[in-house]
Structure formats: C-alpha cells, structure tokens
Curated annotation (Swiss-Prot):
GO terms assigned for molecular function: DNA binding; DNA-directed RNA polymerase activity; magnesium ion binding; zinc ion binding
Binding partners and assembly: In plastids the minimal PEP RNA polymerase catalytic core is composed of four subunits: alpha, beta, beta', and beta''. When a (nuclear-encoded) sigma factor is associated with the core the holoenzyme is formed, which can initiate transcription.
Protein name listed in UniProt: DNA-directed RNA polymerase subunit beta'
Record-stated family: Belongs to the RNA polymerase beta' chain family. RpoC1 subfamily.
Lineage: Eukaryota, Viridiplantae, Streptophyta, Embryophyta, Tracheophyta
Binding residues annotated for Mg(2+), in chain numbering: 489, 491, 493
Cofactor binding note from Swiss-Prot or TrEMBL: Binds 1 Mg(2+) ion per subunit. Binds 1 Zn(2+) ion per subunit.
Keywords: Chloroplast, DNA-directed RNA polymerase, Magnesium, Metal-binding, Nucleotidyltransferase, Plastid, Transcription, Transferase, Zinc
Origin species: Cycas taitungensis (Prince sago)
Gene Ontology CC terms, in alphabetical order: chloroplast; DNA-directed RNA polymerase complex; mitochondrion
Length: 681
C-alpha cells in the first residue's frame, strides 16, 4: 500500500513485467510460489467458497475472514506465540481480510499482448515510435499481417518486402524464393513474426536516443524548406513536422522516466484485488458478479486454450494457433477498453460489459466520482446570486448553511459563555433557533474565512476565500466583480463552500486566497475583476441624463405643464440633500439639477476655454455666467462666489461611491495590517 507519510505525490505510468510479478508473487514458508491465476473459476457453485488458483483464490489474495484459512482453522492475528503464519494444508496466510483490497494476482499470458490504450487510441504511441501508419501498426497486433523479425538488423529481401497477409496465395508466392515447403515451419518461427511478439521485438530494437536525434534533424530540415506555393504541399510538410515533434516528445519522456517501450506489450497481465470486483449474494441466494470477473474469465479460458495448442504445436495447424492468439488479444482488449475496436462484448442480456476504461474515465468514473468529487465535512453547496451591496472580499452565507457549517464553533461558544451547560443543551438551543444562536454565530464568523469553489476548477482563481456574513434566503451571494475568476454567472450556477479548520489553512486563506488580493489573472496578468455587460448597463443608466445641455428639452410638452421646472431647476448644496430628495421621490434618478461645487475645485469640460452662453446680473452687482453644463456666480470685482454644476442624482451617487472607494483604499494602504474595509465598487 502507499504510505501517505512517505509519498508526497503519485505518478501513473507503465510497469515492467518484473514489477507486475513482484506485486503478485509470494514465496510461502514451504517454498511454493503463489500469485498466478490459472483457473477461470471464481466461487464453487455449491459452497460459494473461492476456487483454488481461481480469480478469488484465498491462497493468492488472502483469507475472506481475518485469521481463518480455507480449511476453517484460525489463528490470532499478531500473536507472536503462534509459530505458523499460514496453513500447511491449504497454504492460506493467517492475516487480516482487508489484504484482499490491495493484494494482486497475475495471469501469465501464453503470448505477448499489446496494450490497446497505446495501439488503438489517438495518437497511437506505438505507431508514432515505429513511424508507421495506424493500420499498418495494427495489422500485426491482430495477426492480420506478418513481418520479418529484426535478426541482427540485416537488410534481407524478406524484410524489404514489407508486411504480408496470412493467405495461402501469399505463402505460395514467398516460399519458392527461399526453399521448398518441407522446412517452412522452422523458417516461419525463426524469420517471421506476428501478434504481440512482432510489436514487442520491434519496440525492443529501438534506440530512443538515435530516434530522438533523427526526429530533431528531420524537423530542422523541414523547417528550412520554403513554402511550396500550394496548400496541399504546405499541409503535408506541417503534418510531417508535427509527427517529428510527437516522436521527440515521446522518446524524451521514455528516456527521462526510465521506461522501456516494450512495456507497452503485456506478458503477465495483472489481476485486480477481489474486493475491487466483488461478487454480491442477494437475499434469495442469487449471486451478482462484477463485469471484470467475466472479462477475466474469458481471458483465462482463451489463454489456457492457447497454452494447450502451443504445447502440442507439432500436431496443431499454424492457422489455429494464430486465430487463438487473436482471440486472446481481443479478450484482453475487452478487459482494458471494451468496444474500442467496434462491437463490444456483451452479456446474456445484450448489455456491454464495463471495462477498466469505463470504470475509470468519465464523470462517473473513479477519478471524478470517488477521488475528485468526494464530499467532505464542513462543506456545503447552494445556488449563487448577485450581491451588489457586498464588499469585494465578503460573501453572503444563508443562515441555514452557516449554522450547519459552524455548528461545532457555535456549540463551543454557547458553552464558554454559559448559555448551555453541555453538548446536548447547546444542540437543543441551536435546534430551537433562539436569538442568542445568531449572535454567537456572527461572532464566530467574524474572524473565520470560508473558501468558495465552482467546478470545474480550471485555474487558481476557481477557489477564493471570503469573509462570510449572514443573509436571508437560501442562496449564496457574491459581488459581481468576483464572478469573472470563477467563470460564473447568476443563471443557476452552484458553488461549494468550505470551512478551513487548521490555522495553516486559515492563514493561507487570508494571505493568498482572499478575493481582493486576486484582481489579476495569474496566467497573463490582465485584470480579471472587470465590469461585465450587466454592470456596464447599470452604470450607463445611473449616469445618463434625460436631456443634454442647458437648453435640452426646453420646449418638451412635459415642462409646458409645469412652468416651475421649465424656468428653474432645483439646486442642492450637498450629497445628502440631493440623495434625500431622490429617496423622498421629489426628483428622479436622471432628473437634471444644479449641484453646488467647491470654489477651489476644477471643472473639467470638453472645451478648454468655453464662452458663457449668457450672463445674468442682479441689482447689487452680482452676476452669473451661464455655461453649457455649469454656472459661476461672481461679485462686482470678478471674485467667484459660487459654482453650480448641472448633473443628475445618478451621477452624484456614482461620484460618491468612487470617492468612498478611493478613501477606503487610502486607509487600507496606511494601515496594511488591518482588514480591508467595506468597499462598494
């Protein structure tokens, strides 16, 4: 088993035949070697006990009951006084039955079998290494083509002929070139190969360093060629360059990982532990078996048949042996990836068997369903909605979710503050949802961040930390600017919330994962928290006016009914006065008004030196210069007394939000150790 304290990472790759045998072979104290599965049986039909040397054998995989052998004898596990650790009659070790979850077996194949993942899937690694088309590399795998053995790499006329099919006419054309048909059997065994033997010998004869150097030289030569002037020639050169790059990468990977190419051809076939492919007995005595058991059974049946044919090879026709090799290859293909070559193997109910590929890949496979998508404690899930009033670093957590996530902390708080004497009383208070519960919960959440995650997590910003606050409803609320990092929108997307428990996790969340510290894309450095279409539309509606300029809509029919608005617009001296009038519905969001501006503040217009439209004089010498978007009041000596700008309530509100945001960032930069204040962006 893998010790998580000793191993920090897990790498999946090819295993050598020696490694596969080392996983399974064991030497018993009496000197017998066990581990090889030779019989296609699983359980005895009368006793439901595992068959000896079958795919559920207790001698190979361990006892079904801890410390009990197949004979029924028992030993105390871990008792040093017991001399024998295995049964001398049946050969079963007295160990824990959990060993059947990870102890493996193996099947010694009568002929090498090519792993279908590396021959049939695109790109085909075997075809790339051998520099052959996919059909030509698959022909020898299923005994459809024969090739000459690479004996001392001599350029014989047979090798120069290329692959040929197993046909009577083909043999008749080849035999007269060499000798009579009397010694053709020995000649075929020595000079001609097919099946996994042929592919394995070709892969074993490769020099990866020379292959990589030649591919690099070819890529370099093709790169120097000028364009042919037609699309077909250029595409052909580009395909050849891509092929050279794939060969270089593949050869480099084999060299760096110390993996031999011939390991893509299986000689011993590993057998999964029986607990990973169980047989379940129903109430009526009926047995239900896993699909890999049936696929293993077919492999063992066909492999044993091939072994018998090879044992009496003198009396067995060569075509029968070749046909049986093809059946073994197809059985192993169905075990690894059923249906990859067309029609899958089916059971009696016409249902395709689930192979290893079906169990591993896909959304419901082992990786995504059981390893990556496992539910964990202190986590929840809900739909997300927009919370525009939230600061950038906060998220709204529903009360129902928050009380479940922080229940342990709330119980501790209730007991510490003497609101509950014990655990049962604290849970009763939480169940009744008394007001003190929400007070304690808010205190707990104030200093505890949470992590939000939206699947699929394609980059670092798929998980970010937030300061939670309690909200009503059942949906998680998020600031709209952080949705870009999650690639989320508010049309029904769901997000998971996790509570970091350890101090290290909380420190990481505060220092590295808070949303206000992840404003730039880690890939290209561009801003990722930018306004989207809905926010831009809202800003446009907030800042647009219903008319432009001082003369805009002067003769609109609406103002002809209300003369006071046609001649004089309301004036306000502060933000609060203007916003208060809007909340009292005296003016609309886009209604034009005069707003008092600071005398020392600059007025930015589209024209540098704008001439006044008109000048209005009063009796005391005070006059007003009226411009397109503002007016200036001056005394008789020309000193500025007042400035009013023409704006709307929406623009005043937008300006105030920007001002508060800038002040908030200024305070945060002056006190970097304090938490970020509530900023509305």
């Amino acid at each position: 088993m893998i010790d998580r304290d000793k191993h920090q990472q897990l790498r999946i790759g090819l295993a050598s035949p020696e490694q596969i045998c080392a996983w399974s072979k064991r030497i018993l104290p009496n000197g017998r070697i066990v581990g090889q599965v030779t019989k296609p049986y699983t359980l005895h039909y009368k006793t439901n006990e595992p068959e000896k040397d079958g795919s559920f054998c207790e001698r190979i995989f361990g006892p079904i009951k801890s410390g009990v052998c197949a004979c029924g004898n028992s030993r105390v596990i871990g008792n040093e006084k017991e001399n024998s650790k295995f049964c001398e009659q049946c050969g079963v070790e007295f160990v824990d039955s959990r060993i059947r979850r990870y102890r493996m077996g193996y099947i010694e194949l009568a002929c090498p079998v090519v792993h279908v993942w590396y021959s049939k899937r695109l790109p085909s690694y075997i075809a790339n290494l051998l520099a052959k088309p996919l059909k030509e590399s698959e022909g020898p795998v299923y005994c459809d083509l024969f090739i000459a053995r690479p004996i001392a790499n001599k350029p014989t006329s047979l090798r120069s002929r290329g692959p040929f099919k197993y046909e009577i006419q083909s043999w008749r054309d080849i035999i007269p070139h060499y000798f009579s048909a009397r010694g053709f059997g020995a000649f075929r065994h020595r000079e001609i190969a097919t099946g996994g033997d042929a592919i394995r010998e070709q892969l074993a004869g490769l020099n990866l360093q020379i292959l990589m150097d030649r591919s690099y030289m070819e890529w370099k030569r093709l790169g120097k060629q000028k364009s042919a002037g037609n699309g077909w020639g250029d595409r052909k050169i580009q395909r050849r360059k891509d092929f050279s790059v794939r060969r270089m990468k593949l050869a480099k990977h084999f060299l760096q990982t110390d993996i031999e190419p011939e390991w893509m051809v299986l000689c011993p076939l590993p057998v999964l532990p029986p607990e990973l492919r169980p047989i379940v007995q129903l109430g009526g005595g009926e047995l239900i078996t896993s699909d890999p058991n049936e696929l293993y059974r077919r492999v063992i049946y066909r492999n044993n048949t091939l072994t018998d044919l090879l044992a009496r090879s003198r009396s067995t026709p060569g075509g029968l042996v070749i046909c049986q090799k093809k059946l073994v290859q197809e059985a192993v293909d169905a075990l690894l990836d059923n249906g990859i070559r067309g029609q899958p193997m089916r059971d009696s109910h016409d249902r395709p068997y689930k192979s290893f590929s079906d169990v591993i890949e896909g959304k419901e496979g082992r990786s995504r369903e059981n390893l990556l998508g496992k539910r964990v404690d202190y986590s929840g899930r809900s739909v997300i909605v927009v919370g525009p009033s939230l600061p950038l670093h906060q998220c709204g957590l529903p009360r129902e979710i928050a009380i479940e996530l922080f229940q342990a902390f709330v119980i501790r708080g209730l007991i510490r503050r003497h609101f509950a004497p014990n655990l049962r009383a604290a849970k009763s208070i939480i169940r009744d949802k008394e007001p003190i519960v929400w007070e304690v919960l808010q205190g707990v959440m104030q200093g505890h961040p949470v992590s939000l995650n939206r699947a699929p997590t394609l980059h670092r910003l798929g998980i970010q930390a937030f300061q939670p606050i309690l909200v009503e409803g059942r949906a998680i609320r998020l600031h709209p600017l952080v949705c870009g990092g999650f690639n989320a929108d508010s049309d029904g997307d769901q997000m998971a919330v996790h509570v970091p428990l350890s101090l290290e996790a909380q420190a990481e969340a505060r220092l590295l994962m808070f949303s206000h510290t992840n404003l730039l894309s880690p890939a290209i450095g561009d801003p990722i928290s930018v306004p989207t279409q809905d926010m831009l539309l809202g800003l446009y509606i907030l800042t647009v006016g219903n008319n432009q300029g001082i003369y805009g809509n002067r003769y609109h029919p609406y103002y002809s009914k209300y003369k006071i608005f046609s001649c004089k617009k309301p004036s306000f001296y502060s933000y609060d006065d203007a916003l208060g009038a809007h909340w009292q519905k005296r003016i609309e969001l886009d209604s034009p008004l005069w707003f008092r501006w600071g005398v020392g503040l600059r007025i930015i217009t589209s024209v540098d030196r704008e001439a006044p439209i008109e000048v209005q004089y009063e009796s005391l010498g005070i006059f007003h210069e009226i411009y397109e978007h503002y007016r200036i009041g001056k005394n008789e000596v020309g000193e500025i007394l007042s400035i009013y700008i023409r704006t709307t309530v929406g623009r005043i509100r937008f300006d105030r939000e920007i001002e508060e945001a800038i002040q908030g960032f200024s305070r945060a930069s002056e006190h970097p150790n304090k938490s970020l204040p509530a900023i509305i962006i």
